[in-house]
Amino acid sequence: MNFVEELRWRGMIHDIMPGTEEHLNKGMTSAYVGIDPTADSLHIGHLVGVMMLRHFQRAGHRPIALIGGATGMIGDPSMKSAERVLLDEATLRHNQDCIKQQLAKFLDFDSDAPNAAKLVNNYDWMKDYSFLGFIRDIGKHITVNYMMAKDSVKKRLSAESSTGLSFTEFSYQLLQGYDYLYLYRNEGCRLQMGGSDQWGNITTGTELIRRKDGGEAFALTCPLITKADGGKFGKTESGNIWLDPARTSPYAFYQFWLNVSDADAEKYIKIFTGLNQDEIAELASRQAEAPHLRPLQKRLAEEITVMVHSREAYDAAVEASEILFGKSTTEQLRKLDEATLLDVFAGVPQYHVERSRIATGISLVDLLADATDIFPSKGELRKTVKAGGVSLNKEKVADAEQTVGEDDLLSDRYLLAQKGKKSYYLIIVE
């Protein structure tokens, strides 16, 4: 199966320029995907392009990841409604270094093979290009009529857009077009890939290559990822799902994939994993027979968490999930780092207690029915303890008068109270 066929069955092709597949079938070629460096981490919205490069390399071709250091200083108007904040060079360089470390989990940069991946930054070839030189060498080959016909430009100039379009952003497609020309000349790059909103910018590049060098280059875009319910992919109430564990914990990352709908799971497992058709068909069959067991979601969450983080991080995320949703022990609870603990219990009621009350030792009855109002009265607490319905840090409480001290704290500042099987309360000691 060739690269285009691989993407096609995975549902990863939106538009493809005629002749692309035939060109790729002639032998190894190079293709690039542009990556916005405005943060020091990729988020899962970037993963479609990254997976395209991964499949490209696996098919024997050479992937190039282009960090948009220069274009990131400007901003792409495609499908955006407002001008972006511009970043300085030092921040962009830092972001590039962080992004390369993440890309190395998907692409082989270190191989001696001729199709080893390469990372480039368009700031390196744009920084010394004068404005006069650029508009003379590049601008004269692309007409304003051609640029105005792009959907991204039309949308920003329409009556429904109140922000208009700055000249800076209008010039973006020329810069992206020049990137393609530069890589065509210097890296033998014949294909640019991206999201479907990038088609206009990519074809500006193929047109520039044709007019400047009389060359032939190709374009391929993937669909913008959507959710079955029409919601925006990759966003939660707390924002983006990042690949950096400091921004999104491996537990929260795992939970995101585990909780996608059945319809989305079957689509996403094709896009975001390397599982083959037979493996996915078998999982889909099991899902149809027993949807409550969620085999698609579980395998999707496993594959992508291991790929982005590690097998150990995945195992820890599964174990953390069991703390909230299944049987677990105090030992498992104590193994959680602070960030994961807070993610696991993000939705439970929280109470704050002064450290002085814990430092000297406080009885459980005073903690849960006085220092907090987890129980409305001490009598109610004693009654529930007697019935075996109270736990502290996942241990059943046998004595309502037991003393709680600093040795009981999780991560030196938390206590987890539980009433019955499902009601949790996080006590924060300050």
Swiss-Prot record:
Binding residues for ATP: 235
PROSITE patterns, per database record: AA_TRNA_LIGASE_I, S4
Keyword ATP-binding among UniProt keywords: yes
Swiss-Prot/TrEMBL catalytic activity: tRNA(Tyr) + L-tyrosine + ATP = L-tyrosyl-tRNA(Tyr) + AMP + diphosphate + H(+)
Class of this enzyme: ligase
List of residues binding L-tyrosine: 32, 172, 176
Domain spans labelled S4 RNA-binding: 362-430
Residue interval(s) of motif 'HIGH' region: 37-46
Ligase found in the keyword field: yes
InterPro entries in alphabetical order: aa-tRNA-synth_I_CS (IPR001412), aa-tRNA-synth_Ic (IPR002305), Rossmann-like_a/b/a_fold (IPR014729), S4_RNA-bd_sf (IPR036986), SYY-like_C (IPR054608), Tyr-tRNA-ligase (IPR002307), Tyr-tRNA-ligase_bac-type (IPR024088), Tyr-tRNA-ligase_bac_1 (IPR024107)
Residue positions of motif 'KMSKS' region: 232-236
Gene Ontology biological process: tyrosyl-tRNA aminoacylation
Keywords: Aminoacyl-tRNA synthetase, ATP-binding, Cytoplasm, Ligase, Nucleotide-binding, Protein biosynthesis, RNA-binding
GO MF assignments: ATP binding; RNA binding; tyrosine-tRNA ligase activity
Subcellular compartments: Cytoplasm
A cellular component term, taken from the record's GO annotations: cytosol
This enzyme's EC code(s): 6.1.1.1
NCBIfam families linked: tyrS (TIGR00234)
PANTHER family referenced in this protein's UniProt entry, alphabetically: TYROSINE--TRNA LIGASE, MITOCHONDRIAL (PTHR11766:SF0), TYROSYL-TRNA SYNTHETASE (PTHR11766)
Family: Belongs to the class-I aminoacyl-tRNA synthetase family. TyrS type 1 subfamily.
Subunit structure as annotated in this protein's UniProt entry: Homodimer.
Function in brief: Catalyzes the attachment of tyrosine to tRNA(Tyr) in a two-step reaction: tyrosine is first activated by ATP to form Tyr-AMP and then transferred to the acceptor end of tRNA(Tyr).
Protein name: Tyrosine--tRNA ligase
Originating species: Porphyromonas gingivalis (strain ATCC BAA-308 / W83)
Gene for this chain: tyrS
